[in-house]
Amino acid sequence: MVLFHAQASGRNRVKADAIVLPFWHFKDAKNAASFEAEFEPSYLPALENFQGKTGEIELLYSSPKAKEKRIVLLGLGKNEELTSDVVFQTYATLTRVLRKAKCSTVNIILPTISELRLSAEEFLVGLSSGILSLNYDYPRYNKVDRNLETPLSKVTVIGIVPKMADAIFRKEAAIFEGVYLTRDLVNRNADEITPKKLAEVALNLGKEFPSIDTKVLGKDAIAKEKMGLLLAVSKGSCVDPHFIVVRYQGRPKSKDHTVLIGKGVTFDSGGLDLKPGKSMLTMKEDMAGGATVLGILSALAVLELPINVTGIIPATENAIDGASYKMGDVYVGMSGLSVEICSTDAEGRLILADAITYALKYCKPTRIIDFATLTGAMVVSLGEEVAGFFSNNDVLAEDLLEASAETSEPLWRLPLVKKYDKTLHSDIADMKNLGSNRAGAITAALFLQRFLEESSVAWAHLDIAGTAYHEKEEDRYPKYASGFGVRSILYYLENSLSK
């Protein structure tokens, strides 16, 4: 984890591998201009072609007497067009350049804070989170990687009051510990991150933090609770399912209680409805919802927010053998509702249904938010940059959108179209697990909503199928697991304290 430090002036700054000077579009930032006497011979020729456009970067060598070996000219664009997301993406791009240049220690000069259209807090959150997002290294198994980049180890931010800035940096670092945990769990081998291993990670959180209590139900306990849908999905696997319940109590006397549910399919072959080989290559990431829940809870415990949150992860493989659950058969969930299986590859909604029922029975939730890499239809609809979500409560939906805007984790609300619910009709069961071949993300959400029908609990379903994992580098994320959802939900939970 990179260490951040703030100081008001650059006079006594420490030596570093690089110094970053900010520039507006076709205009010097005043704080950068104040360093011209020190660096002008080095960067003046480069300014002839440097325009200061958003994300524009010029990497130069410094003068021999300077404290930094390299000078980086950083374009911030136009001040009047600056947003927190622009700041996030700009400093994320900067981080990628610095890592490739093997600059481990960096001094970053801020533009004049009082002249920004953003607040100091918004700018610093965007800066630190952009750096932290791209300063992650995913687990590697190769002995030698000659292209390995050098991660940033220390960033000194110059031009801000340290007391305020350092508090922001500590908060973002704690949040990204949770993001990194989520990414690590998703990126590792499916043979390593089994349902049992996810349970061990959850149990270790309980050992590390007094505010966390973890309970794990094994196969027999799952059967005792009559979670027939989770058991059905697990039938084809040689590893047992685990049902993980992690309770964080930051405000024990309060009745307000958020339940987070994460899909925990640690590998998804599709079952008897077997996926094509190419589609199966990334299916170790089908537990990203569960990993997101663990990342949120670990960060909550570090931040010590005065709030009550329970995380629930139904964890299993969706594997294939002679015992696999079969298309056309009917299984009964914990709710007592029966489901006709039309596709064994629509397994995520089945295990989430049992988790929702468990939450309603045992947790007395004020609200339920679930996370799942649920449908390919969502990827087709919104791509890999935006997660779609559904909600039965307008206040919850608006609060999630507010947190989304603060954290550069784009969410888009989709409708729960009642008319489409009829596509789930079954002649032999209470419902089918698959609707028509259209509006697949909506019908999946409608399936989940059926298990909340008699409840007044506010609910949101985040389909992170497109955003959880990227096979190439993105503006906001490194390659592979993104940890999408950890930051926005933590901001949502923190914001709820003032409402």
UniProtKB/Swiss-Prot annotation:
A Pfam family this chain is assigned to: Peptidase_M17_N
Cofactor(s) this protein requires: Mn(2+)
Enzyme nomenclature, EC number: 3.4.11.1, 3.4.11.10
Active site (record annotation): K275, R349
Record keywords, A-Z: Aminopeptidase, Cytoplasm, Hydrolase, Manganese, Metal-binding, Protease
Gene Ontology annotations for the cellular component aspect, listed alphabetically: cytoplasm
Record GO biological process: proteolysis
Binding site for Mn(2+) 1: D268, D345, E347
HAMAP family: Cytosol_peptidase_M17
Family: Belongs to the peptidase M17 family.
Name the UniProt record assigns to this protein: Probable cytosol aminopeptidase
Gene name of the record: pepA
